[in-house]
Design a protein with these regions (language model features):
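Charged (Asp/Glu and Lys/Arg) segments that form or flank catalytic channels of large polymer-
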Residues: 1-25, 62-64, 69-91, 95-199
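Acidic, metal-ligating active-site segments
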Residues: 22-68
């Protein structure tokens, strides 16, 4: 459904270039002291059986990992916000050349030129990274712990809850809460989210 809806917003004759991002910070030594934070790119247009091959994913770059001078600094809200801001500004730096293609891009597929517009369709990440991408509170004990909707913690396991009983977390409504200084009411961090500007 997302694919069709998104493709309908593109100019006539253009197709969707589905970007899939994979991100996971990893340790690079046996002591766990050194870390790298790679971000990979794949395409949703590639069939799943092919997309899972090693050569169908490309390293887009490494996101910086900020190190605190001490535990006090590490726990400070200033440092935590700096980490979040750095993450989102780094994503902007990495993704802007792709996303800002105002007239799309022509790709040669089977000797035929096809007009595409790139859009991020999926971000694959673990819980802490999903929180960083969405800028939601990291604790599963927060009032609204879900990255996708504004369901309360008490209703997370409620199997009788209807989708109409919750409000989805969309770019627009999260941005509105942020711009109205109400981000804490929906458990998002006080940092501007790069993805709010994405088409």
């Amino acid at each position: 459904m997302w694919w069709k809806t998104t493709e309908d917003t593109l100019p006539t004759g253009a197709r969707l270039l589905s970007l899939i991002l994979y991100s996971d910070a990893t340790t690079t030594d046996t002591l766990g002291k050194n870390q790298l934070h790679p971000i990979y790119l794949s395409l949703g247009n590639i069939p799943t059986w092919r997309r899972n091959k090693q050569d169908a994913k490309k390293l887009l770059g490494y996101l910086p990992i900020l190190k605190a001078a001490n535990n006090t600094e590490k726990k400070s809200s200033i440092f935590k916000n700096l980490v979040r801001e750095t993450f989102h500004k780094s994503l902007k730096l990495l993704l802007n050349p792709i996303i800002s293609l105002k007239t799309g891009v022509d790709l040669l597929i089977n000797d035929k030129s096809t007009w595409f517009y790139p859009r991020i369709s999926v971000i694959i990440a673990d819980w802490p990274e999903a929180s960083t991408f969405c800028l939601t509170y990291k604790s599963s004990n927060s009032k609204l712990p879900c990255h996708f909707c504004l369901v309360t913690r008490d209703n997370l396991a409620n199997i009788n809850l209807l989708s109409s009983d919750t409000e989805p977390r969309t770019h627009q409504n999260m941005r509105n809460y942020f711009e109205e200084n109400n981000e804490k009411s929906v458990c998002i961090e006080s940092v501007y989210n790069f993805f709010w500007n994405m088409p």
